């Protein structure tokens, strides 16, 4: 079973990804956050509670507060086994490559 965490400040974007992933029998969305800081806090809570961490995080780059690039940098340092895929739009190539430099495994176009 692949455990996914969705991190995006747009609630409807998270809902859209959730609906797409619900159809996959071997994927489960285990957590959602609206920004990088709350994503890290959620991961810390899961770790303290000895609950399984996500295998993959789908991370938006442009969010208020802590953006996806900084969150990716911090998460990959602390939890290097979690794969992060940066979510970006066509006009955000610099953000996608910044995410890769921060430790993301790849990126997806929204």
What positions do the PLM features span?
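Short amphipathic alpha-helix used as the core "switch/output" element in two-component signaling
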Residues: 41, 69-81
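A short, hydrophobic beta-strand element within the central beta-sheet of small alpha/beta folds
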Residues: 55, 81-91, 108
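Acidic, metal-coordinating helix/loop segments flanking the phosphotransfer/catalytic sites
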Residues: 34-56
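Acidic catalytic/metal-coordinating carboxylates
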Residues: 35-38, 64-70
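Active-site T/S-Asp motif of two-component receiver
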Residues: 58-60, 71
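Conserved acidic segment of CheY-like receiver
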Residues: 1-13, 17-21, 57
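Active-site residues of response regulator receiver
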Residues: 8, 60, 88
